Amino acid sequence: MGKTYTGVDIGDSSIKLAVCDGATVSKVAIETLPDGLVVDGRVVSHDAMADLIKSVVKNTGGVPKDAAFVVPGTDSLFRRLSLPAMTEKELKLNLPYEFRDYISQGKDRYVYDYAMLGMQEGPDGAPEGMDLLAVAASKQAIADYTEMFRRAGLHLRVALPEQAAYQNLVGGNPNALANCCVIDFSHHVTKLHFFLDGAYDVARVIEIGGIDIDRAIAHVFGVDEHVADQYKRSNFENSQTSEAVRGVYQSIAVEIGRALNFYGFNNPNTTIEAAYCCGGGSLLVPLVEAVADHADIRVSSITDVLPSSKVSAEETIRCPAAIGATMKVGR
């Protein structure tokens, strides 16, 4: 058992908080975001978001004040790198250069960090190379988020991209297969996170998500998308299995199959053995079944690789990145 953190993950449609000490998830809170608070993955008002976080914390009876935050992709740059072996000082000097194709000017306006994945040794046992996850984030964005958490009554202690959060969950986890993918069925998109030999490799984004299921239900029942979302969650009048909705499931399953095949084509010596499903869409059994029928791999829940939990799987399955953000912190 280590120090307890509150993991925070802000998505396009909801904010997720998870309290974890690295071994056990003790509390989860999920709140739907007001319309317009997050647009295209970017927080529109940090003050309004801070007030929402403060309200969520109050409604859950309080959480540890040290926050581990999943930085949105719009505010960070991520790369997996293979570099010659070098000292920590040399690596810190070299990291800005590795982002030169993404940051054309003002590299000093960014903060850089990394997580080591592994080292390669030569015949004599001396280090020859190293694999790592590298991230760059704007100093202004980090300052804005630091102030946001301060206003919410929390302290920003850890900031990391979602790729590092998933690496914390899967890397070195005896319950996770080394060659696997995490499928996040989120509101606007479906994202596949691929792992190679237990290390985060790459992500693929499918531009179909829960909102498309909502739209199909809205069309069938003649309601707006917000009502359709409630119909979906409660399976009102078997809305989860209507013909129109099954068509969306099949579209998602086909695109997932294509993404898996494309990854296999680029990595002919690797076989993805399992897909761990998460996100709100993973609670839709017909959707997961459609993916399992189409993909020639084992499909299971992300709960297979999550820490033990005092809260329900229906909650933890929706916030794996928030949980992952709290793990391996200072450990």
Q: Model-found features: residue ranges?
A:
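Non-catalytic, solvent-exposed interaction/assembly segments
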Residues: 1-98, 102, 143, 151-153
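Gly/Thr-rich phosphate-binding beta-strand-loop-beta motif of the actin/hexokinase/Hsp70
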Residues: 1-34, 64-72, 171-202, 206-212, ...
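Glycine-rich phosphate-binding loop plus the immediately following alpha-helix
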Residues: 38, 139-168, 199-238
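Short glycine-rich phosphate-binding loop at a beta-alpha junction
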Residues: 62-74, 149, 154-158, 267-280
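Active-site neighborhood for divalent-cation/phosphate handling
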Residues: 71-172, 304-308
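Glycine-rich phosphate-binding/hydrolytic loop that grips phosphoryl groups
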Residues: 165, 211, 282, 300-331
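Adenine-nucleotide phosphate-binding core of ATP-dependent small-molecule kinases
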Residues: 219, 227-274, 281, 321
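Glycine-rich phosphate-binding loops at beta-strand->alpha-helix junctions
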Residues: 270-300
